[in-house]
Amino acid sequence: MAAEEKDPLSYFAAYGSSSSDSESSDEEKEAERSKNRSIKRPFPTDTKKLPGPDELFRNVSRPAFLYNPLNKQIDWESRVKRAPEEPPKEFKVWKTNAVPPPESYQVAEKKAPPPELDMAIKWSNVYQDNGDDAPHANQAKSLEEEEAREDSPPSDDEQEKAFAIKKRKV
């Protein structure tokens, strides 16, 4: 029965190899594995490893071009490269149709509309109703003048004119 049982990982094994081979021994398998390991390593183990950081910084010196011979310090000011300065740009106001903020907003003063005729006068002219009772634009009077006339007694000429006008209406 042992020969009939299969290794569950044998499905993933390479083609043509089987785990049920009883011919190969454990020693032979270990020999093959050691050969495969030696083939996978590209670098031989005899090479020297890189030095550690402490050892490296003890041995490495700074390049001579960074030093000022008088001070023995790095002259960073002579090494600095600065971009050329551009002239300041002029501020240009964008032209938009947006409503300006309330602080800068000034109401544009509009011209007053032309004085319109009284609608009664306009309609009487349209329909040519220019009788005695038709309104006239030039007869507009202020209240002060009317009050002054009411206070004073009417003269004879004014009474006759008023009487003649009343006769015409009737």
UniProtKB/Swiss-Prot annotation:
Segments of skewed composition (Acidic residues): 144-159
Stretches that traverse the bilayer: none
InterPro entries per record: DUF4660
Positions of region (Disordered): 1-56, 124-170
Chain intervals with Basic and acidic residues compositional bias: 46-56
PANTHER family in UniProt: UPF0690 PROTEIN C1ORF52
Family statement: Belongs to the UPF0690 family.
Protein name listed in UniProt: UPF0690 protein C1orf52 homolog
